[in-house]
């Protein structure tokens, strides 16, 4: 899977492409699921200007086995940090370092990240919008979640007022570079002014969008508005002895 990320601040506008690849797993998934090839191309026009939720709704309008599907997503944070999903008018208790959840395609989900290493008291509130689904073998959904990594660099950049957009995509095996993957994420920089969603679409199939920075709870804003209505989240225990997918990413 891949992610696309962009930074923007008062004096900084940058777009990156970041990636992590599980070559054998991605090829197996694509070969065993012909529908994936039929989904291309997408052509995301003016995607960067769309408000949160619009891209997921647009994807649902294209049809396919998406509506009502609960897609596993694993959010990963630096060691010691805690991640909590929104629920009701607040947040559930945070889980350390990794949170495995099931999200519907289309809604926007707000999360809270706390206890960031070296940043006592800092809280950040990223959102995740799932725009497509994976097609793993039957009974293997939880072994192959969409991975969303929150790096310390990104968290600190968001805390400084920069806005980060990352698009996680399923890499096209015909474009993949067969490298031995390390635990750290591999990043490819896109040109300034490029839309990370469009870049991700050229390299594979966009799966989810992470947005972070620039939003904290406002006293004049209702809790439900800030939480985008707090759509229900399915929380999973992580499977034992799981082989995680490595996926390329655009940031």
Which sequence ranges carry the predicted segments?
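Short, intrinsically disordered, low-complexity terminal/loop segments
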Residues: 2, 250-251
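Bacterial N-terminal signal peptides
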Residues: 16-32
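A general "mature secreted/periplasmic domain" signal
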Residues: 38-250
């Amino acid at each position: 899977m891949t992610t696309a990320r962009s930074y923007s601040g008062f004096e900084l506008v940058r777009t990156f492409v970041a990636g992590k690849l599980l070559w054998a797993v991605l090829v197996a998934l694509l070969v065993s699921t012909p529908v994936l090839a039929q989904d291309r191309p997408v052509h995301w026009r003016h995607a960067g200007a769309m408000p949160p939720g619009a891209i997921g709704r647009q994807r649902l309008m294209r049809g396919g086995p998406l509506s009502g599907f609960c897609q596993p997503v694993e959010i990963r944070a630096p060691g010691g940090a805690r991640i909590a999903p929104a629920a009701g008018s607040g947040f559930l208790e945070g889980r350390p370092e990794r949170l495995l959840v099931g999200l519907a395609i289309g809604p926007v989900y707000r999360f809270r990240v706390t206890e960031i290493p070296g940043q006592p008291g800092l809280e950040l509130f990223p959102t995740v919008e799932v725009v497509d689904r994976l097609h793993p073998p039957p009974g293997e959904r939880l072994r192959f979640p969409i991975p969303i990594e929150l790096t310390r660099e990104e968290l600190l950049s968001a805390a400084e007022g920069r806005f980060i957009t990352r698009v996680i995509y399923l890499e096209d095996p015909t474009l993949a570079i067969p490298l031995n993957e390390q635990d750290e994420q591999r990043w490819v920089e896109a040109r300034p002014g490029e839309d990370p969603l469009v870049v991700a679409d050229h390299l594979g199939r966009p799966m989810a969008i992470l947005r972070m920075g620039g939003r904290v709870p406002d006293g004049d804003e209702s809790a439900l508005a800030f939480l985008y209505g707090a759509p229900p989240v399915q929380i999973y225990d992580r499977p034992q002895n799981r082989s995680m997918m490595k996926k390329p990413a655009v940031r």
